[in-house]
Swiss-Prot record:
Induction: Expressed during multiple stages of host plant infection, including the prepenetration, early biotrophy, late biotrophy, transition and necrotrophy.
Protein name: Host transcription reprogramming factor 3
Compartment annotation: Secreted; Host nucleus
Mapped zinc finger ranges (C2H2-type): 79-102
Signal peptide per UniProt: 1-19
Classification lineage: Eukaryota, Fungi, Dikarya, Ascomycota, Pezizomycotina
InterPro entries recorded: Znf_C2H2_type
PROSITE patterns noted in UniProt: ZINC_FINGER_C2H2_2 (PS50157)
Protein's UniProt keywords contain Transcription regulation: yes
Its job: Probable secreted effector that translocates into the nuclei of host cells to reprogram the expression of targeted genes by binding on effector binding elements in rice.
UniProt GO molecular function: zinc ion binding
One term under GO cellular component: extracellular region
Keyword Metal-binding applies: yes
Principal location: secreted
Length: 126
């Protein structure tokens, strides 16, 4: 590589870096918080092949916890209860919510066996 090529590449990187917004608000507006972004990346892309079974299980639980606290991600990748509107990231979590929060309250016993009727699946994401 010639010196002029290296200086051109450095100039390009400098121009790109200086054009990017530097405020923290702009960064937060574009990205979800780092732990949630990392977990979402691993699970969505299936990049967990380097993990042991226990690490994979632990990662899955952390993902469900982290994403369940983020309403925007629940609405994109999760399940929404048609009865009360609460969201859960996984189907089993939604089934538990319905059985424990709505059982004998506002969903009659005979209908609680047909939980799928009360779950709206949302999959707008990748």
């Amino acid at each position: 590589m010639h010196l002029s090529t290296v200086s051109q590449i450095l100039a390009l990187f400098t121009a790109v870096a200086s054009s990017a917004p530097t405020s923290h608000a702009a960064v937060r507006a574009r990205h979800v918080s780092p732990p949630e972004a990392d977990l979402l990346h691993v699970v969505k892309r299936g990049d967990d092949t380097d993990f042991s079974d226990w690490q994979r299980y632990s990662l899955w639980n952390k993902r469900v916890e982290a994403l369940s606290r983020n309403p925007e991600l629940v609405s994109r990748y999760g399940y929404k209860c048609n009865s009360c509107g609460k969201g859960r990231m996984d189907e089993n979590g939604m089934r538990r919510h319905i059985m424990f929060d709505h059982y004998s309250k506002d969903i009659p016993l005979e209908k609680s066996a047909h939980v799928n009727k009360y779950i709206e699946f949302r999959n707008k994401g990748g």
